[in-house]
């Protein structure tokens, strides 16, 4: 099908000035990008060969947005309309984040990971987990099946690239317990990562405040990064602290990149908690110094103050060693429970970024156990006051009754830090959006319109052209996408049409599942998935694999 988009205000993703243009989509490809009126003013639809003409007067035409930190690994397959992302103009997502996802795995590792990140992605019992390798997972994305295992010929809603998750790899080789790898285990992890990248992963992620990935010392990570770098991939760490010692944690990651030659992409880069208020400039100075020395660094952020994670992440890492059953046993043992309380309330656990838990900042956003549903939307401190218990006792009780599956919002951010970092020359957008839970973080529905509406148009922090570049062309370059991420002839027809005067995020913390305003059309590989502001139900996304030439594109290697 050919679609002519006429009289659009083109913002092409390069950062160049906007211009008026006609753009012709021919199936999955952008066939023509010409001055406005060239196609629409002198030729009829029949003469251009267009099956449809969209008059885009007053609308901006941009590349589809690229979510550099997505947690849609399971939801792309389970809730296939994926309206949360399509409704905000996202056409490509980067999965496998924070060191924990579902490939590569063996049976035991998959069972442990499913339970561990149920608060991120849910854990459906009736779902067919019919892959074990990264290649098989990417094949599954390209061959979507219904829950009964029968193929329906559909596709996923967005395009998706994948990071091999370091914590999952470590669990497969070493289990979920603490400890340093033997030389043989180190080599085995590197071999697993090499295989994953040869099957299409674009890099490696870590979650260094999540077990078991956080048990890795710098030397262990360096070996893994060398393998990733040799294959032209990048390292995307959720590093060891966004609170106490945050700058040292960033410096460790930058040092890894410098020493191993592996490109670095800092996940949800920010400076949180009271001690880091107003300190974003120190982080940016650290990054700029490394960039000037030739270190390859990019980063992503979400444009909100609270973070989102699991309640179990607040535990000290030693308390989570060995997986769910071992953790629950420690919470049930009075002596060990007292040690956990001391770590959380007196010293500040490594899981809580070295900061003493502030119970009034930890808001329950989702639970696995329906009996706990009444806690959603309340902080641990609120629940303690209502039930006349101590906050730590509430914390431990919820973890136990929900088998560590509780999701939370963590209200610890600073607006001045968010604004400073989003203006940096390495910045890209990443929602870090969790799509499950009764009251998930609104960033899952609002990240990209919030950048364009609130921060660009309303506050003027970035020009429209700069903002679109941050959300499309720049992340496409980091991912080494082949002919994708710009509005240019011969590129993939992933495009968005939005009203620059009305685009805004509508999702709030009270009502988080609200579609954005102002996005009129979204095309994924040339197929309209949002049409006139409404979802079409079409799914046209593809798995995007790293190929042997170093570029990332659809299709087998």
Task: Give the location of each predicted region.
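Divalent metal-coordination and catalytic microenvironments
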Residues: 8, 28, 58, 69, ...
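Alpha-helical scaffold segments that flank or form the walls of functional sites
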Residues: 74-163, 182-199, 222-230
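Divalent metal-binding pocket/active-site signature
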Residues: 195-253
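Active-site neighborhoods of metal-dependent hydrolases
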Residues: 137-141, 147-173, 179-183, 189-210, ...
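C-terminal cap of metal-dependent C-N hydrolases
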Residues: 333, 420-426, 431-432, 496-542
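Acidic, glycine-enriched loop/beta-strand segments at the rims
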Residues: 11-22, 406-412, 418, 459, ...
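Histidine-rich, glycine-flanked metal-binding segment
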Residues: 1-3, 10-64, 79, 505
